[in-house]
């Protein structure tokens, strides 16, 4: 049985989180679709928050 791919919105959130940890700005969001962009920005915000709390360096 094949594994299912993760949904696109979940992947957008994860990519945004990784971008935030990597120090990218929110203007570097690669998504044009409003839902995917919203998820990416949510992940980016979570990562910035985690970095500010000292969870990541």
UniProtKB/Swiss-Prot annotation:
Predominant place of localization: cytoplasm
InterPro entries in the cross-refs: Ribosome_modulation_factor (IPR007040), RMF_sf (IPR023200)
Cellular-component GO terms for this entry: cytoplasm
Membrane-crossing residue ranges in chain numbering: none
Residue ranges, annotated region (Disordered): 1-24
Keyword list, A-Z: Cytoplasm, Translation regulation
Localisation: Cytoplasm
One GO BP: regulation of translation
Residues making up the signal peptide according to the UniProt record: none
Protein family (similarity comment): Belongs to the ribosome modulation factor family.
Function per UniProt: During stationary phase, converts 70S ribosomes to an inactive dimeric form (100S ribosomes).
Protein name: Ribosome modulation factor 2
Source species of the chain: Colwellia psychrerythraea (strain 34H / ATCC BAA-681)
Gene: rmf2
């Amino acid at each position: 049985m094949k594994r299912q791919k993760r949904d696109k919105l979940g992947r957008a959130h994860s990519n945004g989180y990784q971008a935030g940890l990597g120090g990218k700005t929110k203007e570097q969001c690669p998504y044009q679709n409003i839902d995917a962009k919203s998820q990416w920005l949510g992940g980016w915000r979570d990562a910035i928050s985690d970095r500010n709390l000292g969870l990541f360096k």
